[in-house]
UniProtKB/Swiss-Prot annotation:
Homodimer. This is Uroporphyrinogen decarboxylase. Pathway: Porphyrin-containing compound metabolism; protoporphyrin-IX biosynthesis; coproporphyrinogen-III from 5-aminolevulinate: step 4/4. Substrate binds at residues 22-26, 71, 145, 200, 310. SUPFAM superfamilies: UROD/MetE-like (SSF51726). It comes from Thermoplasma acidophilum (strain ATCC 25905 / DSM 1728 / JCM 9062 / NBRC 15155 / AMRC-C165). GO terms for molecular function: uroporphyrinogen decarboxylase activity. GO terms for cellular component: cytosol.
Length: 333
């Protein structure tokens, strides 16, 4: 069994596994070759393109796992939502809640949902033996995309809905939660080895807001998936309360704002940790210094995966990233 599969399942392993969020992205020459002739939507509609872009970091960078090339808005079409990708903006939901009301957010029916990304997962599994990670956005993060034109990054509109339209908020969050569970099961059936939830904007919530308005839904997702696949929960800017989340995730993926040594001491030994290098420093020699500190701080844990604390930047130098991977792999356990 490879180091990633061993680490995420809690088995002994002889080297620290490494992968990066957004490793199949704009910093790679192979990705940019596709982008020169195809839009994002066209790329994500081709299983063969998805497989190629997904696997390239394994070959080029030497990471220990691939993450399927997709977007967190991918399954929203199965809820009756129309998503467009705009240059320099990203995904925009045309029939968002502010325009069309919560009735626009339909119940997700897995029996009628088909997407090229699911076929791509199956194709990837047929072609390659290395670990493959599936994913979905967290429910409140997805809500930030469907509530208005463009993403509500600071959750201003989401918070207004939480407080002034709580029943509507609960109805939408329940539908998103049900969809995420079903979409995860579809990815598991197609062949992914682990599943990560991206709650990128959770840090805009206070600890109390998260506990009351978000945690019950995230908890339900992770509980439903428990035992069927190793799970990773990623959030950013949550340093003040991530150790107290008490979620049934197998791993917490943390950002660079959290001290690894302190966090490791605060959570149960059976929980895994993933992270947490600042992606902005990857191109500099200083990244190796920071990586050594992170790895040393996590050295007492059996379940640890090296990663950045958020997605890689388009300016990332592939050769510098490869050097970082080689360095982490060289650390003696």
């Amino acid at each position: 069994m490879d180091p990633f599969r061993k680490a995420i399942k809690g088995y002994d392993h002889d080297r620290i596994p490494v992968w990066f969020m957004r490793q199949a992205g704009r910093y790679l020459p192979s990705y940019m070759k596709y982008r020169q002739r195809m839009g994002i939507e066209e790329m994500m509609s081709s299983p063969d393109v998805i497989v190629d872009v997904t696997h390239d970091p394994v070959d080029r960078i030497g990471v220990d796992a691939a993450i399927i090339f997709a977007d967190i808005t991918t399954p929203l079409s199965g809820m009756g939502l129309r998503v467009r990708f705009l240059d320099s903006v990203g995904p925009v939901v045309e029939n968002n809640i502010e325009k069309s009301g919560i009735s626009a957010v339909e119940e997700f029916d897995p029996s009628s949902f088909s997407h090229p990304v699911l076929k791509a997962i199956s194709k990837y599994r047929e072609r390659y033996a290395d670990p493959l990670i599936g994913f979905a956005g967290g429910p409140v993060t997805l809500l930030s995309y469907i509530i208005s034109d463009g993403v509500d990054r600071d959750l201003f509109r989401v918070k207004r809905m939480m407080i002034t339209e709580e029943k509507a908020y609960q109805a939408v969050m329940t539908r998103l939660t049900d969809m995420i569970i079903e979409f995860a099961r579809m990815q598991i059936s197609a062949g992914v080895d682990a599943f990560q939830i991206f709650d990128s904007w959770a840090g805009y919530l206070s600890p109390g807001e998260y506990e009351h308005f978000v945690k019950p839904y995230v908890y339900d997702i992770l509980q439903e998936l428990s035992g069927s696949i190793p799970t990773i929960y990623f959030s950013t800017m949550t340093s003040s309360y991530v150790a107290d989340m008490d979620l049934p995730a197998d791993f917490y993926s943390i950002d660079w704002r959290i001290d690894m040594k302190r966090f490791s001491a605060e959570i149960p030994d059976e929980k895994g940790i993933q992270g947490n290098l600042d992606p902005a420093i990857v191109n500099y020699d200083y990244a190796l210094h920071e990586a050594s500190k992170i790895v040393e701080a996590a050295s007492g844990r059996d379940r640890y995966i090296f990663n950045t604390g958020h997605g890689l930047l388009p300016s990332t130098d592939p050769e510098k990233l490869k050097r970082l991977v080689e360095y982490v792999h060289s650390v003696n356990l």
